[in-house]
Amino acid sequence: MKIAIVNDMPMAIEALRRALAFEPAHQVIWVAANGADAVQRSIEQTPDLILMDLIMPVMDGVEATRRIMAETPCAIVIVTVDREQNMRRVFEAMGHGALDVVDTPAIGGPNPREAAAPLLRKILNIDWLMGQRVGRERVVTTSRSEVSRRDRLVAIGSSAGGPAALEILLKGLPENFPAAIVLVQHVDQVFAAGMAEWLCSASGMPVRLAKEGETPQVGVVLLAGTNHHIRLLKDGTLAYTAEPVNEVYRPSIDVFFESVTRYWTGEAVGVLLTGMGRDGAQGLKAMRERGFLTIAQDQASSAVYGMPKAAAAIDAAVEIRPLHTIAPRLMEVFTQ
């Protein structure tokens, strides 16, 4: 993979170079000391992946991510030494299309390969997303008599560009929105709590992490909060599970959507927002085949038109909509 590093700190650049050296297939093709330089270098030589710092002179990583995704889109991972202090910037960058975030690898520890492992895993996942994905088995639905009834649910999946899209969608809903909402966003567990807090503050909706064993409820927006998948169980409660182990993204949107197909017998709407790859497309199709309304974000309003495009390609979405129209449509569905 051809990789670029955008960072103004020589020690951080060296740490990233050393980490990447453990995987011979990775090649650093250029290094930029600020965001403005990175924008220009990306025009001249677009890499497969950019490792982007947040705090830099001239142009920061948030604006650089926005410019690059608009002009020469490629995969971007945010690399930071202080994720808690930079949490808002992290989610702003992800809103512009950054795929993920990882800590800067440590230099000088007793096990440099172990220190490099989190970064290398992120890159492996992104490399997989840029390739082809095999089809999933179709879900087998359970009869209505075998499950307990729940009333109204909105199941939302998002990835790259998701934080900003979720903020816009949730801002468009009133506090008394008459349906439970569960969000599955591709974000590492260490950032999930910060994302829930940020979404709560930015959108004005009560957003928190979903707890094992709780039931989706009206008036609360639940965000999948671990590196395991989240599922709806037969009794209507939520559970985290390591299975299936072969899913690259954890939590998987497909896994949650398919569990909704099996066990939710009230009204439900599936929404698939911006993101790279195909996660969520098959699950959305299963929801449509179950008789639920399914909505995919349109290309023009998507930061990364990957997952919604995959859904549209297999006719998984009943409706394809601009982002700003999705909240009003949900209100229309649940207030008739």
Swiss-Prot record:
Gene Ontology cellular-component annotations: cytoplasm
Subcellular location: Cytoplasm
Membrane spanning stretches: none
Post-translational modification: Phosphorylated by CheA. Phosphorylation of the N-terminal regulatory domain activates the methylesterase activity.
Keywords: Chemotaxis, Cytoplasm, Hydrolase, Phosphoprotein
Domain CheB-type methylesterase: residue ranges: 147-336
Documented EC number(s): 3.1.1.61, 3.5.1.44
Catalytic reaction list: [protein]-L-glutamate 5-O-methyl ester + H2O = L-glutamyl-[protein] + methanol + H(+); L-glutaminyl-[protein] + H2O = L-glutamyl-[protein] + NH4(+)
GO MF assignments: phosphorelay response regulator activity; protein-glutamate methylesterase activity; protein-glutamine glutaminase activity
4-aspartylphosphate: modified positions: D53
Catalytic residues as annotated in Swiss-Prot or TrEMBL: S159, H186, D279
Any Pfam family the entry gives: Response_reg
InterPro entries, per database record: CheB-like (IPR008248), CheB_C (IPR035909), CheY-like_superfamily (IPR011006), Sig_transdc_resp-reg_Me-estase (IPR000673), Sig_transdc_resp-reg_receiver (IPR001789)
Keyword Nucleus attached: no
All residue ranges annotated as the Response regulatory domain in the record: 2-119
One of the GO biological process terms: chemotaxis
Function: Involved in chemotaxis. Part of a chemotaxis signal transduction system that modulates chemotaxis in response to various stimuli. Catalyzes the demethylation of specific methylglutamate residues introduced into the chemoreceptors (methyl-accepting chemotaxis proteins or MCP) by CheR. Also mediates the irreversible deamidation of specific glutamine residues to glutamic acid.
Family that this chain belongs to: Belongs to the CheB family.
HAMAP family attached to this UniProt entry: CheB_chemtxs
Domain notes per entry: Contains a C-terminal catalytic domain, and an N-terminal region which modulates catalytic activity.
Official protein name in the record: Protein-glutamate methylesterase/protein-glutamine glutaminase 3
Organism: Pseudomonas syringae pv. tomato (strain ATCC BAA-871 / DC3000)
Gene: cheB3
